[in-house]
Amino acid sequence: QHLRAEYGSLLAMCDEKLGEVLDLLDQYDMWKDTMVIVNTDHGFLLSEHGEWAKCHCPFYNEVARIPLFIWNPQTGRKGIHTSSLVQTIDLPATILRQFEIDIPQQMEGIPLQGVLEHDEKIRDVALFGLFGGQLNATDGRYVYMKSPVDWDEPIYQYTLMPMRHGGKRGFIQDEELKGIELYWECTFTRGLPVMKIPCRKLPAQGRYPTMLFDL
């Protein structure tokens, strides 16, 4: 109960600070030429489903279905809710399109202007998941959470920065770097290789079965 109260306090602070930003947009008459995007990276479990925090499978709705509010002064639409499937990778493409900047060919996100203007359907399935854990797909009605066939099979980190993310953060150790290979198959690196580094799964990833939910 104490931690829930602390989290509620954090949300209240975020709400107040967001309100201050919106008040400034009112004060300086900025709505007519300012795009506003409010988004976050993940939700947070507060004991729902018997779980806590975020980075472990399954990615329930409380973690995966994140808020996204967009004001586009070019359309002026407000108070509209859309069921179009969008992802955070769409935001950079949306910003580039807004400023009439060419979207790089290797960028896999889809600009959201069509969604904002007339609820355009831009994808049939949205993908999300956790490194070394479940790979999930949803069409908005169902979500399929595919677990690895072999939880003990080797996994690799693909990067140009030899840093470990999540769990024990910091530089990847010398012994791990001895096993690196160059990997050329990433579509978003402009034909440049990245390091393929053997790594370990995080204990928090768990070993859950493949699941299917009707949302």
Positions of the model-derived regions?
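C-terminal, low-complexity/hydrophilic appendages and adjacent surface loops
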Residues: 60-61, 131-215
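A long, amphipathic alpha-helix that forms part
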Residues: 1-34, 98
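Short glycine/proline-rich turn/loop motifs
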Residues: 1-6, 71-77, 215
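Polar, surface-exposed loop/tail segments
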Residues: 32-34, 79-139
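Short loop segments at secondary-structure junctions
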Residues: 16, 72-75, 100-102, 140-142, ...
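Histidine-centered active-site microenvironments of extracellular/periplasmic hydrolases
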Residues: 24-80, 84-87, 106-108, 123-124
